[in-house]
From Swiss-Prot:
Disulfide bonds: none annotated. NCBIfam families: L12. GO terms for molecular function: mRNA binding; structural constituent of ribosome. This is Large ribosomal subunit protein bL12. Forms part of the ribosomal stalk which helps the ribosome interact with GTP-bound translation factors. Is thus essential for accurate translation. PANTHER family: 39S RIBOSOMAL PROTEIN L12, LARGE RIBOSOMAL SUBUNIT PROTEIN BL12M. Belongs to the bacterial ribosomal protein bL12 family. One of its GO terms (biological process) is translation. Homodimer. Part of the ribosomal stalk of the 50S ribosomal subunit. Forms a multimeric L10(L12)X complex, where L10 forms an elongated spine to which 2 to 4 L12 dimers bind in a sequential fashion. Binds GTP-bound translation factors. GO terms for cellular component: cytosolic large ribosomal subunit. SUPFAM superfamilies: ClpS-like, Ribosomal protein L7/12, oligomerisation (N-terminal) domain.
């Protein structure tokens, strides 16, 4: 005696929700499977959206170049640091000159430091 798919569907339709839950649990035990829904990987799309929405940038001095004195002056003007601190920052490259600034401020600082002879990245 063979049961068709239609007969199985009719039997499901006639069951209460609790009976269906019990049937699913029994099937999981019998066949060693889980009826849990698979998790869809959406992390890559979220990371792309986060990159587009970035509003804070870090200005990183990668090298003071040949004009160390000019770069130190530019750092002092941009950060308000003293001579000793600005010199230490220029010599510690790569180092973040300013962190969590707007894109416009980051671009302006990058331009100022590059004009002084430094190599700069915005992250």
């Amino acid at each position: 005696m063979s049961i068709t798919k239609d007969q199985i569907l009719e039997a499901f339709a006639a069951m209460s929700v609790m009976e269906v839950v019990e049937l699913i649990e029994a099937m999981e035990e019998k066949f060693g499977v889980s009826a849990a829904a698979a998790v869809v990987a959406g992390g890559a799309a979220d990371a792309g959206a986060a990159a587009e929405e970035k509003t804070e940038f870090d200005v990183v001095l990668t090298s003071h170049g040949d004009n160390k004195v000019g770069v130190i002056k530019a750092i002092r003007g941009a950060t308000g640091l003293g001579l000793k601190e600005a010199k230490a920052m220029a010599e510690a490259a790569p180092v973040a000159v300013k962190e969590a600034v707007s894109k416009e401020e980051a671009e302006a600082l990058k331009k100022e430091l590059e004009e002084a002879g430094a190599q700069v990245e915005i992250k």
